[in-house]
């Protein structure tokens, strides 16, 4: 399997963040990953996606079967361009590559937003406002390989150690006149983080299998 496939996948995982510190390394693999991350970041920042600020935007569509109105006010999304690289290390003697990167926080605030749709004379409406913060998004793991970049590399196995530090949500959600805020806040603040933690091993194993499947398909 080609090493470039895995390296590209790892770089994409960091595509929404910029290293918060400069890392000098003589390892060609680590340099390659860092350079790819920086290239993605340039695209993201150049597109104005971090920070993303929307003061006021509205949309309206009127069709024969569908009429739609939507608006967003005072939206701000930050944090995607901040990544902490805890470890990127290639042990050529053991044929192991360790990586550990963290996005400290992704933050979303919405002053007000809403949507109203008329589908075949059935009206559906929803309102959303509030804040959402995801803390310490961690992508870590270990890759075992055979060979070298000169003669070719085969990925033998991947072990993932992903997770989040927590979710803080304070949102107001109304759908068709019914207030679902309390239930959604409980789900985001408690149920979802607890579920991710309880099934962390299964999620990491599944993620590793998916990455291996992508690598196998591309090679």
Task: Identify what each model region corresponds to.
Residues 14-154, 161, 218-219:
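Tubular lipid-binding modules of the TULIP superfamily
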Residues 2-17:
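Cleavable N-terminal signal peptides of Sec/SRP-targeted secreted and luminal proteins
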Residues 144-212, 216:
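Extended amphipathic ligand-handling, pore-lining, and cofactor/metal-binding catalytic surfaces
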Residues 3-5, 30, 180:
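Short amphipathic alpha-helical segments that mediate assembly, nucleic-acid/protein binding
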């Amino acid at each position: 399997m080609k090493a470039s496939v895995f390296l590209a996948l790892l770089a994409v995982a960091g595509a929404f963040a910029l290293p918060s510190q400069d890392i000098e390394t003589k390892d060609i693999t680590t340099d390659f990953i860092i350079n790819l991350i920086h290239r993605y970041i340039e695209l993201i920042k150049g597109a104005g996606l971090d920070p993303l600020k929307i003061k006021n935007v509205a949309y309206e569509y009127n069709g024969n079967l569908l009429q739609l109105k939507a608006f967003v006010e005072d939206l701000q999304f930050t944090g995607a361009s901040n990544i902490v690289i805890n470890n990127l290390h290639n042990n050529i003697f053991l044929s192991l590559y360790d990586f550990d990167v963290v996005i400290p926080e992704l933050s979303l605030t919405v002053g007000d937003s809403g949507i109203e749709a008329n589908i075949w004379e059935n009206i559906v409406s929803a309102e959303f406002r509030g804040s959402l913060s995801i803390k310490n998004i961690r992508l870590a793991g270990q890759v075992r390989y055979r060979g070298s970049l000169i003669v070719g590399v085969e990925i033998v196995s991947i072990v993932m150690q992903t997770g989040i530090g927590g979710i803080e949500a304070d949102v107001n959600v109304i759908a068709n006149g019914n207030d679902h805020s309390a239930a959604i806040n409980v789900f985001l603040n408690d149920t979802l983080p607890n579920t991710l933690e309880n099934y962390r091993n299964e999620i990491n194993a599944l993620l590793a299998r998916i990455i291996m499947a992508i690598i196998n398909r591309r090679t």
